[in-house]
Amino acid sequence: MADYFCRDAIVRWHCTNERFTAEEYIRANCQYPGNWRGELERVIKKGDCIVTAARVYAADGAPSFHVASFYRLREGRIAELDEYWGDDGPAPAWRRSLGLGVPIPE
């Protein structure tokens, strides 16, 4: 994976206020507990920026998360990566009690 990153790349996980080097980011992902799978749901590319939305889930089916990732490339490699993670689950009770929204069709 290191070949995809610039030597001075910076990765930020905003939801947990963490900043990593590329090496630390790769290590954090490789050593993350459990067996994980992922599905890329959306990709948008404009100039040197790529935005992805993905679902990441445990191999046994639970838990499940979604991540929005913002990549800035330099010379074809990742120079900056900003990720925003969210837990998948039902809408909160207060919103359900108001009768707002409906489930997104699969």
Describe the residue ranges of each PLM region.
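C-terminal and inter-domain tail/linker signature
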Residues: 1-106
